[in-house]
């Protein structure tokens, strides 16, 4: 947010990750967010190295997997990051250092950590995360990781020998689940997830 404001570039609505600058029809940089429209735009501009399979059946499966990643893997990530105290403390401590100066005064860091943690934990209901649904989300994630691991043992990517837009969508969420948040990281390591080596 601060970087875009410093460049006098209008903030995207809503602010999601990733955010990249793409030029509009007048060659003015515009902050563009959400991987799906970004990939679709890049597909049009750089058609020689596409991330969407040429085969219509595979392209359809790719869209389904990409949508699953955007809608459901996000729920896993948000649930694990903010539902459990250890994970929320971890994220609340680190995220202010990503968005703000690394050398925040201790008091200011503590205030930002408290604000972010409270804001995000109060939004858990948006992704369907609660004490009542926690076990269901956990079982679903473990089932997903087990199936993904079996697939990745046979194939380096979701749809074959090269990455697709579905792989990129999976990567965004799985990089956090495998590397950043303590609870899902342990689950992935317990499953010996092949992907964790590649992230």
Pin down the residues of each PLM region.
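GST-like domain detector, emphasizing the conserved glutathione-binding G-site
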Residues: 1-107, 158
